[in-house]
Amino acid sequence: MAEGRIIKALSGFYYVQSDNQQFVCKGRGLFRNKKITPLVGDYVEFEPKDDNEGYIMEIKERSNELVRPPIANIDQAIIVSSAVDPDFTTLLLDRFLVLIESKHIQPIILITKVDLLNEDQLENIKLYKQHYEKIGYRVELVSSKNQDLLPELEPYFDEKVSVFAGQSGVGKSSLINVLDPSLLLETAEISKSLGRGKHTTRHVELMKIGNGLVADTPGFSVLEFREIEAEELADSFPEFNARMHLCKFRGCMHDKEPKCAVKEAVENEEIAVFRYNHYLRFLEEIQTRKPRY
């Protein structure tokens, strides 16, 4: 039995990297019977059939996993937001952050296309950068067309498995192409009617960049909090986490309760109003969602 890691999944075949060799594998029927799907990023045991084929026999325990995109054992998520075309939106960025935080994955925020901004727009983006850095997030402003800005990003990938996430058309593929031009990933054109990119990435694949592995994932059209309960939502807002123990009532939802430390922090401008408003919006969404059967 050999061991390796799934680096690509395509049409029911799993490409397993084992040392310096790659095997094209199928999953055992047992996985289907147990409704277990091998994921890109999985560590597996497999039985080689010949020089480059085999069968996956066992999937090792996962440290974490995402459903959309379907990937496991991630060290960090690089959330890409464009400054313009499509326009920067903190609401969408916060949706990504909540989902990533709920999986206990380290987020990094990249805001792309800053070279397309005028001076006032750039100052506005820098203010948002300060807000997120105050929370504790790492934020970088980059242009995917300016290669001089990207070498400083390479240390982020060192010895880590990173997942790129973000609305389609924000520049994920362009960024990866600058980091490693040999990959030649197709870049998205922006739909003028929708204000978002057409999907260009059709499958999840781990690609070697420097000393790390990076997944360029399919663009998202829907971001839902299906796996997050209302009482868990505040845990995905780090600036709330630091104050929740000061709320008068245990189980405080930071909404209508009196003597709430989070609401006091908003009033004292210690927590950004836009972040709190997003929390309330997400909370209502979770509380009013239809049950799944």
UniProtKB/Swiss-Prot annotation:
Chain ranges of the CP-type G domain: 63-223
Subcellular location(s) of the protein: Cytoplasm
InterPro entries attached to this UniProt entry: G_CP_dom (IPR030378), NA-bd_OB-fold (IPR012340), P-loop_NTPase (IPR027417), Ribosome_biogen_GTPase_RsgA (IPR004881), RsgA_GTPase_dom (IPR010914), RsgA_N (IPR031944)
Residues that hold Zn(2+) according to the record: C247, C252, H254, C260
Binding annotation for GTP: T112, K113, V114, D115, G166, Q167, S168, G169, V170, G171, K172, S173, S174
Entry note: cofactor: Binds 1 zinc ion per subunit.
Cofactor(s) needed by this chain: Zn(2+)
Enzyme nomenclature, EC number: 3.6.1.-
SUPFAM superfamilies: Nucleic acid-binding proteins, P-loop containing nucleoside triphosphate hydrolases
Pfam families registered for this protein in UniProt: RsgA_GTPase (PF03193), RsgA_N (PF16745)
Entry keyword rRNA-binding: yes
Keywords: Cytoplasm, GTP-binding, Hydrolase, Metal-binding, Nucleotide-binding, Ribosome biogenesis, RNA-binding, rRNA-binding, Zinc
Highest rank taxon of the organism: Bacteria
GO MF assignments: GTP binding; GTPase activity; metal ion binding; rRNA binding
Signal peptide: none
One term under GO cellular component: cytoplasm
NCBIfam families per UniProt: ribosome small subunit-dependent GTPase A
Role description: One of several proteins that assist in the late maturation steps of the functional core of the 30S ribosomal subunit. Helps release RbfA from mature subunits. May play a role in the assembly of ribosomal proteins into the subunit. Circularly permuted GTPase that catalyzes slow GTP hydrolysis, GTPase activity is stimulated by the 30S ribosomal subunit.
Family of the protein in this entry: Belongs to the TRAFAC class YlqF/YawG GTPase family. RsgA subfamily.
Subunit structure: Monomer. Associates with 30S ribosomal subunit, binds 16S rRNA.
Name recorded for this polypeptide: Small ribosomal subunit biogenesis GTPase RsgA 2
Organism the protein comes from: Oceanobacillus iheyensis (strain DSM 14371 / CIP 107618 / JCM 11309 / KCTC 3954 / HTE831)
Gene transcribed to yield this protein: rsgA2
